[in-house]
Structures are given as C-alpha cells and as structure tokens.
C-alpha cells in the first residue's frame, strides 16, 4: 500500500512539474482564448494520466467566452489536482464542470463525488481560500489560494463552497478583455 501511495505521489509530482513547465514556457500568456477549448484540453490531459478520474463537462455559453489559457489552466488544474489528491482511495472519481453565461461573464460550477472538505472547514468553507489553509496532512495550503486569486484577476469571485457531499465550488469569471 505504501508503495502504491509513493508511486501515486511520484506521478503527481511529474504532472505538476509538467503543468509548471507549460506555464513557464509561455511566460504566462494573457491573450484570450476560447474557454470551451481550454477546458476540454485540460480534462483530456488529466483523464489520460488517471484512468479512474472522469471529468464531465457541460458548456452553455450564449456567445464564446474568452480567457487567458494560463489563467484557466491555473484554476482548473489546481481544482482537479486537489480532487485527485483528496480522493486517491476512490475507484472512480467523478468531476462535473458546468459552465454557463455569455461572452462577458460565466458561472462555473465544479463538483466532485469525493470526501469533501475536512471537518475544520465545513462550518467556514471560505477559509479554504486563505493562504496556508489545508485539510491534507501533506498539503501546503496554496492551491485554493491560487485558484481564488486567479479568479479575482479576471474580475470574478467565488460564490459558493460546500464540502458536505463531495466538494463543490461555484464561481464567476468576469470580463477578460
């Protein structure tokens, strides 16, 4: 069992390194790209690395919403990585991403069928967005803080966090032009 955990951690480190290399190669490009295309590429990457992870995407945007690919990757890669790290014991991890809105702003509903938030965050779930807050023993508490600041960088905001039955976060991404 310990060997399985060590192997899983090694894969996670490799994937995180790959993600960071992708971002640094582009020097954090802020030019807008279609969110629909970005989110599908992100989901495919994670599902190809983890056969037990299923990412279901539903997009209902009246007009194309555009965002920096790097900002979108930071947000969604961190959310998916957190879900994976919290739920390595699951046979199947289902992640649902629902995106709806217009070309000016979208609402994103991200949820997984995992363990949810740690007990310390159930009454005050927004605390998880603060720097160095984590429910994992080996967590550093930066992932959700980075997600939150990336959302705010595009005039967005986190509206709902619930960790009772799996993890759920609903947030708005604003105008990026």
Show where each model-derived region lies:
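Conserved catalytic submotifs in the C-terminal HATPase_c
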Residues: 54-64
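Conserved glycine-rich
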Residues: 156-157
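Glycine-rich/acidic phosphate-handling loop/turn and adjacent ATP-lid/helix
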Residues: 111-136
């Amino acid at each position: 069992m310990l060997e399985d955990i060590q192997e899983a951690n090694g894969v996670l480190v490799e994937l995180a390194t790959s993600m960071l290399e992708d971002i640094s190669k582009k020097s954090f490009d802020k030019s807008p790209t279609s969110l629909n295309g970005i989110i599908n590429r992100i989901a495919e990457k994670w599902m190809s690395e983890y056969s037990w992870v299923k990412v279901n995407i539903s997009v209902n945007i009246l007009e194309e919403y555009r965002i920096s690919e790097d900002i979108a990757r930071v947000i969604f890669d961190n959310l998916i990585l957190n879900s994976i790290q919290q739920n390595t014991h699951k046979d199947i991890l289902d992640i649902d991403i629902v995106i709806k809105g217009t070309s000016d702003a979208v609402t994103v509903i991200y949820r997984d069928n995992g363990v949810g938030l740690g007990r310390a965050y159930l009454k005050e779930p927004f605390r998880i967005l603060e720097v160095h807050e984590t429910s994992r023993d080996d967590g550093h508490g930066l992932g959700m803080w980075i997600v939150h600041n990336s959302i705010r960088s595009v005039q967005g905001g986190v509206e709902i966090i619930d960790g009772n039955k799996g993890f759920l976060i609903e947030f708005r991404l604003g105008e990026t032009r």
